Design a protein with these regions (language model features):
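TRAFAC-class small GTPase G-domain
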Residues: 1-179
Length: 179
């Protein structure tokens, strides 16, 4: 019986696609917590600021996704373009409760959306920290981020909490389906 399951697993793996996703956003947006919550399937409550990048693999549906969580500090954002060519899609994380930095997040997102290396690649925009009282909601953020004018790439915006896997899986499934 074990042989049958091994053969079925091998067969399933032959149909599995592979892709690379960049998880980008400003520092302290929750990128690393999202990465590890997705990978482990449970809440990750404590992370440290990413200096450089983290890479993990996650299987969603029939797609084996290599996720690159790249630091969001100003000095590291300058390195993002080096990863664009190999990316199949982008997950852009925004701290929806950090009202002082939403404009900066919008500017960074628009720079990504207008990058010639990312044109046509799908963008998942994650509005993180929805559990905080002053978090901006989806409809308001679509206006604040001026997303309706972005026509160069397909995008999907989703409210989430980095420590709650269900919304994250839904979002990354959308991304996997549009790669």
């Amino acid at each position: 019986m074990g042989i049958i399951f091994d053969k079925l697993d091998q067969l399933w793996n032959t149909f599995r696609r592979e892709s690379s996703i960049l998880v980008l956003g400003l520092d302290n947006a929750g990128k690393t917590a999202i990465l590890y919550t997705l990978q482990l399937g449970e809440a990750v409550l404590h992370t440290v600021p990413t200096i450089g990048f983290n890479v993990e693999e996650v299987i969603i549906g029939n797609v084996n996704i290599k996720i690159f969580d790249i630091g969001g500090q100003d000095s590291l954002r300058q390195l993002w373009p080096h990863y664009f060519e190999s990316a199949s899609g982008i997950a852009f994380v925004i701290d929806s409760a950090d009202l002082d930095r939403i404009e900066l997040a919008r500017n960074e997102l628009h720079a990504l959306l207008s990058s010639k290396d990312l044109v046509g690649k799908p963008f998942l925009i994650l509005l993180n920290k929805q559990d905080l009282p002053n978090a901006k909601r989806r409809d308001e953020m679509i206006d604040i981020l001026q997303l309706k004018q972005c026509k160069s790439s397909k995008w999907h915006i989703l409210e989430c909490i980095a420590t709650k896997n269900q919304q994250l899986t839904t979002g990354f499934r959308w991304l996997a389906d549009h790669i």
